[in-house]
């Protein structure tokens, strides 16, 4: 088991194992340069295939009701995934399908929307003994994130992505979303 913080290895590994992830935990490490939540990347051996997951400890100073934040994410991602599946070619609906090769049309739904992984108790979060809330996602391979806007072309792409996200939510008719950061 690899980790950069050996004092937390056992407790973090046990937290990650509280989620409904098939296979054996191979390794994990802190991931990214996030400013709000603590993020970790884990690798699991699933019948000989290495599958990665993102785990986040939610910052309760920023989000005072973490369960509401996660419930909003679940509602939104399920809505978008259902739309993408309804519109997709059959091959695109396979959640663990690898990144399509150049020239192929099908893009897996798991590359277009976050896949929130439930805890083994059925909730979409785990509360550790210290009262910290954790959530887990299937890692989106080959995705790129930016810490800062490096060009106007990148700003346009970000705007296009935000617009596409808003369009995907334009017909959301599910339960009202929770207000997670009050005015």
Residue ranges with predicted function:
Residues 1-29:
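Juxta-kinase regulatory segment immediately upstream of eukaryotic protein kinase catalytic domains
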Residues 27-45, 49-183:
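Conserved ATP-binding subdomain of kinase catalytic cores across diverse folds
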């Amino acid at each position: 088991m690899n980790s950069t913080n050996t004092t937390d290895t056992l407790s973090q590994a046990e937290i990650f194992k509280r989620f409904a992830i098939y296979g054996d935990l191979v390794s994990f490490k802190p991931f990214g340069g996030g400013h709000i939540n603590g993020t970790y990347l884990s690798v699991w051996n699933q019948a000989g295939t290495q599958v990665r997951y993102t785990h986040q400890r939610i910052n309760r100073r920023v989000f005072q009701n973490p369960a509401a934040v996660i419930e909003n994410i679940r509602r939104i991602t399920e809505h978008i995934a259902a739309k993408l599946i309804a519109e997709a070619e059959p091959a695109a609906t396979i959640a663990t399908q690898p990144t399509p090769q150049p020239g192929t049309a099908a893009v897996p739904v798991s590359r277009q929307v976050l896949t929130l992984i439930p805890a083994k108790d059925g909730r979409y979060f785990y509360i550790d003994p210290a009262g910290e809330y954790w959530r887990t996602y299937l890692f989106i391979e080959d995705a790129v994130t930016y810490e800062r806007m490096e060009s106007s072309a990148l700003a346009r792409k970000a705007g296009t992505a935000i617009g596409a996200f808003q369009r995907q939510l334009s017909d959301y008719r599910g339960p009202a979303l929770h207000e997670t950061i009050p005015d």
